[in-house]
Regions:
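Sec-dependent N-terminal signal peptides
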Residues: 4-13
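Conserved, well-structured ligand/cofactor-binding cores
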Residues: 20-153
């Protein structure tokens, strides 16, 4: 009676012991690698070059805002409200930082409704990996803190 239980536990955790860490650089992710990453237990890490691009892409809009330029979704609202200021030029200083964070949290909640049927775990994981890979390519303007949340998924 105990043997089948032990065997089933071993079979359940075996795939996790062979899991690999896949490196994302924003340039070389293939469909085959993406599918492999989607398996349970597979992990991702961003390469040093990818992290450098993430940091640079975050710095660009911050610097532009500091120079007084309106940055869509950072210092000004979205869509029809694009002419409304959300935060002042110094978006990393208070009270502008809190105003910008609050604004973007509100926008995420508005757009993040989940309706059934939910995506399969593998599909959800692939979407997260694609987004992290886009960040590593340096085209998103996302912060390092935001990018750090993705590998945990």
């Amino acid at each position: 009676m105990k043997k089948p239980l032990v065997i089933s536990i071993i079979l359940a955790i075996a795939p996790l012991s062979f899991a690999a860490t896949h490196n994302l650089d924003g340039r070389t992710l293939t469909v085959d690698e993406l599918w492999a990453i989607s398996a349970p237990g597979e992990k991702v890490a961003v390469t040093p070059e990818g992290w450098a691009r993430i940091k640079a892409s975050y710095k660009a809009p911050i610097d532009a805002a500091t120079d007084g330029r309106d940055i869509y979704g950072l210092t000004v609202n979205y869509g029809a409200l694009k002419d409304q200021k959300v935060a002042g030029a110094s978006v990393e200083a208070e009270p502008n930082r809190s105003a910008s964070i609050k604004f973007n949290e509100r926008q995420m909640r508005i757009q993040a409704a989940g309706l059934e049927p939910y995506f399969d775990d593998r599909i959800s994981k692939m979407a997260m990996v694609i987004r992290l890979n886009q960040m590593a390519a340096g085209y998103t303007g996302m912060s390092e803190a935001a990018a750090n949340a993705f590998p945990e998924y």
